[in-house]
Amino acid sequence: MSYRELVVELAREHAEALSDALLELGALSVSVEDADADTPDEQPLFGEPGLTPERTAWTHSRVIALLAPEHEPAVLLAAAANELGLADTPSFSVRAVEEQDWVRLTQSQFDPIPIGERIWVVPSWHDAPDPDALVLELDPGLAFGTGSHPTTRLCMEWLEQSVQKDQSVLDYGCGSGILAILAKKCGANPVFGIDIDPQAVESARHNSERNRAEITYGLPADCPAGEFDIVVANILSNPLKLMASMLSSKVKPGGRIALSGILARQAEEVASVYRQWIDIAVWREHEGWVCLAGTRRESN
């Protein structure tokens, strides 16, 4: 008998509670998605650290629970509904999950990614398509940043055009370390990467070792004193605004800064905060996201 997926469609107010109940009753994993995805009624949800999203689930939600062979879907759902005090057990469907080589399947979903004029981000199980290119070997992982997201791509394109040999670079919110590694491969020295997540710091260190890139990583308390030729921060608009004074102070007079993780509609709001110290504007937009870039004024 194979693993199965229990699929339940229900109203938003019950989706999270049902997910928790199914996990407590033995579901191996549970996900919630928009039951109206890919239709005119699809509802995108957005949120940022420090802010409460306007909606925490979709009006018409779909709960998908992965069950081990020994669990009977109908019995498990009835128990969950009873635990929540629902008058009736929600309607449901069951899908068989085929046995697969999950490692091979996952790897097949990640191909080398070309970025900018000469950058390739290449998973370890692939060969570089162009041996003469600027190659970053990076596997998908828990830390954000493999080059597939528009904000990472924008920052990489900016670094490729901006970094000069022996310039100092600070990557604040380094995630996987991809931007710091690229800066190093473009000739920057020294390069520092900072992140609030210790797991991201360890991931970045591992990725730098794999790419033979000498970079110093740490938590915010480890951020070196002094100023840098280049500061790059790919985070989100709210923390970027909160850290504007600190990040601007890390840029040398005449030095440059690039910021991303910013939706196009948020660009002017973020830029206006930085204009106290930085001459800054939208450098490029891609798929609704922007990269802001600017130069610190000599007088600040």
Swiss-Prot record:
It is an enzyme of class 2 (transferase). It catalyses: L-lysyl-[protein] + 3 S-adenosyl-L-methionine = N(6),N(6),N(6)-trimethyl-L-lysyl-[protein] + 3 S-adenosyl-L-homocysteine + 3 H(+). One of its GO terms (molecular function) is protein-lysine N-methyltransferase activity. Its main location: cytoplasm. S-adenosyl-L-methionine binds at T152, G173, D195, N234. One of its GO terms (biological process) is methylation. It is found in: Cytoplasm. The keyword Signal does not apply. Keywords: Cytoplasm, Methyltransferase, S-adenosyl-L-methionine, Transferase. InterPro entries: Ribosomal_L11_MeTrfase_PrmA (IPR050078), Ribosomal_PrmA_MeTrfase (IPR004498), SAM-dependent_MTases_sf (IPR029063). GO terms for cellular component: cytosol. It holds the Pfam family PrmA. Its EC number is 2.1.1.-. Belongs to the methyltransferase superfamily. PrmA family. HAMAP family: Methyltr_PrmA. Methylates ribosomal protein L11. PANTHER family: ELECTRON TRANSFER FLAVOPROTEIN BETA SUBUNIT LYSINE METHYLTRANSFERASE. NCBIfam families: prmA. This is Ribosomal protein L11 methyltransferase. It comes from Paraburkholderia phymatum (strain DSM 17167 / CIP 108236 / LMG 21445 / STM815) (Burkholderia phymatum).
